[in-house]
Regions:
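Extracellular/virion structural assembly segments
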Residues: 1-17, 145-211, 215-384
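Tryptophan-rich substrate-binding surfaces of secreted polymer-degrading and adhesive proteins
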Residues: 1-155
């Protein structure tokens, strides 16, 4: 069983046609809505100014000034490249906007819906800036539609997908591996219409140090193509402390007329806790709704996403129990990658991007010897 913390959760990379994020500097004036990068505990994070900050007030680091700065999350301090469209909608610009228009805010990497017709004097702040205006009317100009297309693979959700029409799609991003952030594995969730995935990892000199391909993601079931996996796992435990570039190439399955789709990419530290015992139980939480008309008995359906719940027992050694339990508790309050596959299996349904609802360690004895941890893991919503 493998447990992995995802360093890419909330990744806000600087993509093509998107302005770079400057480093925060004390004592320098910052205009309203400007974004700055600041490293917290070894991890670079992005911040956006709620207001115009004069030089004399810009003395406290963004992470310690929540009234001045909006935390945008981990940004990776890298350039993100992809051939997927940044957004399905046109870029926001000043000028008159018709009600019902959806536009892409490149500063926030999100799409926004215009709630009302805006005149040129009204449409001077970007949608993300309007959301934090002190004027209630201005806050109501736009409605947040969520993360834009190219960035959905890094938004920490598997049901929002990055899409590209064509025979393939790629993404490329950097990762600085050191004591504060390590890559032991790469997981891809929420794949659709994909027949193979290739992972290449390049060092700072441009030499490939990893080159792995997972294929045969589809098989025939009585003549019909069937998807074998919605997720994949790559092992990158051989990487040493250095700066790397990760590139993932997704190839569309033969005959597919729709787009290549990826839900989420996870890169991070992985911990192998021990083998999963036989008797694992899997069930799904179905959030769809069915309603029957009381007069005629007709049934209407509202299709929604599902979430998996995995109940499993993992074997370990009693001397390791303190370390394991402390590690699990250290990452509470957020989603992790849970992979209950053993070394000889690679089942998609035994992987979850979610959280531990409950875990316990029933000691069979206090002496050195075998022990076990019982997990109940609930995944986030899939197939939304």
């Amino acid at each position: 069983m493998r447990l992995m913390f995802n360093w890419c959760t909330g990744l806000l990379p600087n993509a093509t046609a998107t302005p770079s994020m400057d480093q925060w500097v004390a004592g320098v004036a910052v205009p309203k809505g400007a974004q700055r990068r600041y490293t917290v505990s070894g991890l670079p994070r992005g911040y956006q100014a709620y207001w115009s900050i004069p030089a004399g007030f810009n003395t406290v680091t963004p992470n310690n000034a929540p009234l001045l700065w909006r935390d945008l999350g981990y940004i990776g301090a890298t350039t993100f490249k992809t051939d997927a469209p940044l957004s399905d909608f046109p870029d926001w610009s000043t000028g008159a906007v018709a009600a019902g228009t959806i536009m892409y805010d490149k500063f926030a990497r999100r799409d926004y819906y215009c709630n009302q017709a805006l005149t040129s004097p009204q449409n001077v702040l970007s949608p993300s800036q309007c959301a934090y205006s002190a004027i209630a009317e201005v806050r109501g100009y736009w409605r947040d539609m969520g993360v834009a297309n190219a960035f959905r693979m890094f938004d920490g959700e598997t049901y929002t997908r990055t899409r590209r029409v064509g025979s393939s799609m790629y993404c490329e991003f950097g990762f600085n591996q050191d004591n504060s952030a390590r890559s032991r594995a790469v997981y891809v969730f929420g794949m659709q219409n994909i027949s193979s995935v290739r992972l290449r990892v390049y060092n700072s000199g441009g030499t490939a140090v990893e080159d792995q391909t997972k294929s045969a993601l589809y098989s025939n079931f009585y003549g019909e193509p069937r998807l074998n996996a919605l997720s994949l796992a790559f092992d990158t435990t051989t990487l040493i402390d250095a700066t790397y570039t990760f590139r993932l190439d997704f190839t569309k399955k033969s005959g597919a007329s729709t787009s290549v789709e990826v839900g989420m990419i996870a890169v991070g530290e992985a911990f192998d806790l021990g083998p999963t015992r036989q008797g694992l139980r899997l069930r799904h939480l179905n959030f769809s709704r069915q309603q029957r008309d009381e007069t005629f008995g007709l049934v209407s359906f509202l299709r929604r996403g599902v979430a998996k719940v995995i109940s499993a027992t993992v074997l370990c050694n009693n001397p390791d129990s303190d370390t394991i339990l402390r590690g699990i508790n250290a990452y509470r309050g957020g989603a992790l990658v849970w992979d209950f596959n053993n070394a000889d299996t690679a089942f998609d349904h035994l992987r979850a991007w979610g959280f531990s609802r409950d875990h316990e360690y029933p000691y069979r004895g206090l002496a050195d010897g075998p022990g076990e941890i019982q997990f109940e893991v609930e995944g986030l919503v899939e197939e939304g």
